[in-house]
């Protein structure tokens, strides 16, 4: 055929009325017994100016009739060759089917388009490299149970297992049920694994039906009894949050215990927890264990609130445990919830521990989260000799060194812990050494040291004043009175020695 005719055949969408039947036939736009063929858009054809059908349906019809020329034309119009092959198989035009198949060399993409089991099998036979097992596997995927029934005796044990698993994964429930009831399967219990993997409760139900109603005992491995299997399934379902799986399993036995509830807590499945906590009257000790587990696993605020609500937010029995777990797992959400809901204060005891070993950055965030004043943390830091925290937090409060020094002095006045007070004074003195104070301020600081029995720091600042040739006799006399009044023997001795040198 000339290339011009080929171009015309491919691109003519509207035949002129004046074209006679002979010309149309010569152009190859005529379908014997049907009439003229005309392309309509990209997906349809018009037959004899009367009937519009999809191109692929026309291809199937042409294949069934064995009409090579029309098939060639429709393929030129971008029809799908798969339908021509199906039609050729339906019309028993095997040579035409093989001829068309030679252009694609893979039958498996055609199979989903076939409804008739006989044509399905004939199509699969076009691929000479495929075997019976491949045919049955594809039949299962496409709901052709009759093919499985026909060839079941030709399948090996391994093939049967593969077919059964394929049916399960493809969710072909009728085939799964039929195989479970009629064919010896090496490991039918795999249906449960696939049910959980696919989150498919229908497969789970079929598995239980086969186990309990048809008594297929090899569904359970490792000599496990049925109750143990059900409890295992309940724990799996709880850990994955599949409440509907748990309810399906409970139809056949088993019970929800602390093991299953713990699995739900561990993986933060609040829906499962809420359902069973509402329906089971659990002992308080069990609820407390679940709450402690939730703290360990850093569960969400909603899960913690749910468990606390069943305890009526009363945690007196496990207060020490909560503090231990908060410290161990570095989670403070439970403390925040208890404070907001019931004003239960666990902040103070845990803060004392946190100040002992946590970083400045962590404590800054903790301080913001619980609205804690910096001086509270500074005093706690002083008690445990965390001078680094004292310096950083005081610097956060007062940027100016002199202001910072005065700020720390005010904290010393309210500090009762002796060792903590010494840490603050030590920090103040280091800050003084790194700053420049006028003599008037130095006198004030010396009196401050005297009032708090800071002998070493008092001697140090007096020596600094002496180096500046500042008369400190009156200062020494005043501070001696303070030392005598408060009975500070070391300070008294040090002042008297200084007075002898002045």
Swiss-Prot record:
Induction: Expressed in the early phase of the viral replicative cycle. Pfam families: DUF249 (PF03158). It comes from the Viruses. InterPro entries: MGF_505 (IPR004858). The keyword Thylakoid does not apply. The keyword DNA-binding does not apply. Keywords: Early protein. Plays a role in virus cell tropism, and may be required for efficient virus replication in macrophages. Belongs to the asfivirus MGF 505 family. This is Protein MGF 505-5R. The lineage of its organism: Viruses, Varidnaviria, Bamfordvirae, Nucleocytoviricota, Pokkesviricetes.
């Amino acid at each position: 055929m000339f290339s011009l005719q080929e171009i015309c055949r491919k691109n003519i969408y509207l035949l002129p009325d004046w074209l006679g039947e002979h010309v149309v036939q010569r152009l190859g736009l005529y379908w014997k017994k049907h009439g003229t063929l005309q392309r309509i858009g990209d997906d349809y054809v018009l037959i004899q100016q009367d009937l519009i059908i999809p191109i692929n349906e026309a291809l199937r019809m042409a294949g069934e009739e064995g009409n090579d020329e029309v098939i060639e034309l429709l393929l030129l119009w971008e029809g799908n060759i798969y339908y021509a092959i199906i039609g050729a198989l339906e019309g028993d035009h095997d040579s035409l089917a093989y001829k068309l198949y030679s252009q694609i060399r893979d039958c498996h993409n055609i199979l989903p388009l076939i409804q008739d089991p006989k044509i399905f099998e004939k199509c699969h036979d076009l691929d000479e490299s495929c075997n019976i097992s491949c045919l049955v596997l594809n039949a299962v995927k496409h709901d052709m149970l009759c093919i499985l029934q026909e060839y079941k005796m030709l399948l090996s044990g391994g093939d049967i297992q593969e077919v059964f698993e394929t049916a399960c994964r493809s969710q072909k429930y009728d085939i799964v049920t039929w195989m479970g009831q009629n064919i010896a399967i090496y490991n039918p219990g795999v249906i449960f694994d696939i049910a959980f993997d696919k989150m498919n409760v229908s497969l789970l139900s079929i598995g239980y039906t086969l186990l309990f109603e048809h008594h297929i005992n090899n569904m359970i491995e490792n000599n496990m009894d049925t109750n143990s299997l059900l409890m295992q399934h309940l724990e799996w379902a709880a850990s994955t949050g599949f409440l509907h799986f748990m309810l399906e399993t409970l139809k056949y036995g088993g019970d929800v215990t602390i093991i299953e509830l713990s699995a739900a807590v561990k993986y933060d499945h609040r829906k499962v927890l809420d359902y069973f906590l509402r329906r089971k009257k659990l002992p308080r000790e069990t609820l407390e264990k679940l709450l402690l587990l939730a703290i360990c696993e850093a569960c969400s605020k909603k899960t913690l609130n749910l468990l606390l609500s069943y305890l009526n937010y009363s945690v007196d029995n496990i207060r020490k445990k909560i503090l231990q777990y908060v410290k161990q797992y570095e989670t403070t959400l439970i403390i925040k919830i208890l404070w907001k809901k019931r004003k239960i204060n666990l902040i103070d005891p845990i803060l004392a521990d946190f100040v002992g070993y946590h970083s400045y950055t962590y404590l800054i965030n903790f301080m913001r989260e619980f609205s804690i004043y910096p001086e509270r943390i500074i005093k706690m830091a002083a008690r445990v000799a965390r001078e680094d925290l004292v310096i950083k937090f005081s610097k956060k409060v007062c940027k100016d060194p002199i202001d910072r020094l005065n700020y720390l002095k005010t904290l010393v006045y309210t500090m009762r812990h002796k060792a903590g007070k010494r840490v603050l004074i030590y920090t103040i003195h280091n800050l003084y050494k790194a700053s420049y104070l006028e003599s008037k301020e130095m006198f004030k600081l010396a009196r401050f040291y005297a009032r708090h029995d800071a002998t070493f720091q008092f001697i140090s600042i007096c020596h600094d004043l002496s180096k500046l040739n500042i008369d400190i006799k009156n200062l020494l006399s005043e501070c001696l009175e303070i030392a005598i009044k408060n009975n500070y023997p070391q300070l008294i001795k040090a002042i008297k020695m200084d007075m002898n040198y002045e």
